[in-house]
């Protein structure tokens, strides 16, 4: 079966001209050679580590740059996108004019013209009926490596008939000198055009912009078809029972869904349709700060040849110091999903989810380590999306900061949050799924809840022990909390017990409850939202 490939004429149709060479869907061995060439300079050059993986630096952008995200406002997006200027809550969907888009596209295509380019054709979505066929164009070898790791790799037979639905042109080396007069945030840009089905990247080298860019597009397209689009990890047990884990970056999605007793469907982005839960991706993008073989053996052993490390400190002998966060706390590794042994094969999808877990990192030390949610509480806490932003996943965030992020992923929502909540709850109700709120953050001791206790809590959810446990109701938040769970320190289940004086918890709880209420006000302009207020905290 011959691979279709791409011609200079096709690139010319995108505005890229006089390309010196096209390296189409390079193999991992070729990428290894390309990204370690001694002639490479700056952020293009990769360093071989003693793990066998290549390490690269992404410069000043060691996380996404949400303030530089734009979507062209036109006939298609005008009345569908959840725009940042509607005053209905924080999101990053700033409108862009067609005129400015044309200018940005010119900057990127000029940057890529006349160069030796890497073109990688991939799928986003494991379900053949709804997947996007995405073509990435870049002049940087390791960026091609990143998308080969993170997206689904087509077979030669699939490549023979590949017709891209979406084009991503990465012009990391170019910047926009006209940003001030165009009313933009900075010289850097991550811009989307849903009519042209294209993403442009300029000024930032961070690999995650390509990954999350396509997630934002799936978040636009799927819910409009009644398919849940979710910022979650997912795994499946021996009996076919599926669990999904929602949570912002760093709350434990990847760690907790990587379980030796269960097969991994995926670690970050999924859909849920009439057939069940399916992965959008073909790889994992795990945080590596303070990574150890003992705490996270699966991720640790996935860091080998073909994995790509970002912004880690590499010692002169090639050793990686995972404890060194001097470049960023948001050190990462991408690797193809088959680097994890315990995965769903051959396609990353399974049946319907029966357990839905909301992960939160409570910086206030108020919420219990686990609680069982009612149907209305499920919608309330999904729309609230309370967590603490953890260090380094966005520029300018270095300490844990309490935040509310709708659907545990407001930064990636292209539609109004209520649309995601409605689709999720509909899917849950159809199969009788149960939701739980799990706090992986802090308590009154000032310390983070141990991974050992959190893992035991997850085990109790997955094996059904939590549903047999006696519960008490935590005041203010009205949460049903188990009194005891196997393998969990009983002293932490009631957060009030972790304080020397319960009045300290009460004061913090009232403060947090007010924040929940204030945040949720923006959803009460609809009857459905107003009906959920009673599921929230009461002071």
Swiss-Prot record:
GO terms for molecular function: ATP binding; metal ion binding; phosphoenolpyruvate carboxykinase (ATP) activity. Pathway: Carbohydrate biosynthesis; gluconeogenesis. GO terms for biological process: gluconeogenesis. GO terms for cellular component: cytosol. It is an enzyme of class 4 (lyase). This is Phosphoenolpyruvate carboxykinase (ATP). Disulfide bonds: none annotated. It comes from the Bacteria. Involved in the gluconeogenesis. Catalyzes the conversion of oxaloacetate (OAA) to phosphoenolpyruvate (PEP) through direct phosphoryl transfer between the nucleoside triphosphate and OAA. Monomer. The keyword Lyase applies. Binds 1 Mn(2+) ion per subunit. Its cofactor is Mn(2+). It is found in: Cytoplasm. Pfam families: PEPCK_ATP (PF01293). ATP binds at residues 212, 231, 247-255, 296, 332, 448-449, 454. Substrate binds at residues 64, 206, 212, 332.
């Amino acid at each position: 079966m011959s691979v279709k490939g791409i011609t200079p004429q096709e690139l010319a149709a995108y505005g890229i001209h006089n390309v010196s060479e096209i390296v189409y869907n390079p193999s991992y061995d070729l990428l290894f050679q390309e990204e370690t060439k001694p002639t490479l300079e700056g952020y293009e050059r990769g360093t071989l580590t003693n793990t066998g993986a290549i390490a690269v630096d992404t410069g000043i952008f060691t996380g996404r740059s949400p303030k530089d995200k734009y979507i062209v406002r036109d006939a298609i997006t005008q009345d569908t996108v959840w725009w940042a200027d509607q005053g209905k809550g924080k999101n990053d969907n700033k409108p862009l004019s067609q005129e400015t888009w044309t200018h940005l596209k010119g900057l990127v295509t000029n940057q890529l013209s006349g160069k030796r380019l890497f073109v990688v054709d991939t799928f986003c979505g494991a379900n053949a009926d709804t997947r996007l066929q995405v073509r990435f164009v870049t002049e940087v070898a390791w960026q091609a490596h990143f998308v080969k790791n993170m997206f689904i790799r087509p077979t030669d037979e699939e490549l023979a008939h590949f017709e891209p639905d979406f084009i991503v042109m990465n012009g990391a080396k170019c910047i926009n000198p006209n940003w001030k007069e165009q009313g933009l945030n900075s010289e850097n840009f991550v811009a989307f055009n849903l009519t042209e089905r294209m993403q442009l990247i300029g000024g930032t080298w961070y690999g995650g912009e390509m990954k999350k860019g396509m997630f934002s597009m799936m978040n636009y397209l799927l819910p409009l078809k009644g398919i849940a689009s979710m910022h979650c990890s997912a795994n499946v047990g021996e009996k076919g029972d599926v669990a999904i884990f929602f949570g912002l970056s760093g709350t434990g999605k990847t760690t907790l869904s990587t379980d030796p007793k269960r097969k991994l469907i995926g670690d970050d982005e999924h859909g849920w349709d009439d057939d069940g839960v399916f992965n959008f991706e073909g790889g994992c993008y795990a945080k590596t700060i303070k990574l150890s073989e003992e705490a996270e053996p699966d991720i640790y052993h996935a860091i080998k040849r073909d994995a790509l490390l970002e912004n880690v400190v590499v010692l002169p002998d090639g050793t990686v110091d995972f404890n060194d966060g001097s470049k960023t706390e948001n050190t990462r590794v991408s690797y193809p999903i088959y680097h994890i042994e315990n995965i769903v094969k051959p396609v990353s999808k399974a049946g319907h989810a029966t357990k839905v877990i909301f992960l939160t990192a409570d910086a206030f030390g108020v919420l219990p380590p686990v609680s069982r949610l009612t149907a209305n509480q499920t919608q309330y806490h999904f729309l609230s999306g309370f967590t603490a932003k953890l260090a380094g996943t966005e520029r300018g965030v270095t300490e844990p900061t309490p935040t509310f992020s709708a659907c545990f992923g407001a930064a990636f929502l292209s539609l109004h949050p209520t649309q995601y909540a409605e689709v999720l709850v509909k899917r849950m109700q159809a199969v009788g799924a149960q939701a739980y709120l799990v706090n992986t953050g802090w308590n009154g001791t000032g310390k983070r809840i141990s991974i050992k206790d959190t893992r035991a809590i997850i085990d109790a959810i997955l094996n059904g022990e939590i549903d047999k446990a006696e519960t008490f109701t935590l005041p203010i938040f009205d949460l049903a909390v188990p009194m005891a769970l196997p393998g969990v320190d009983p002293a932490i289940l009631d957060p009030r017990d972790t304080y020397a004086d319960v009045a300290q918890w009460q004061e913090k709880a009232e403060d947090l409850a007010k924040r929940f209420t204030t945040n949720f006000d923006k959803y009460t302009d609809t009857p459905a939202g107003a009906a959920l207020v009673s599921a929230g905290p009461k002071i």
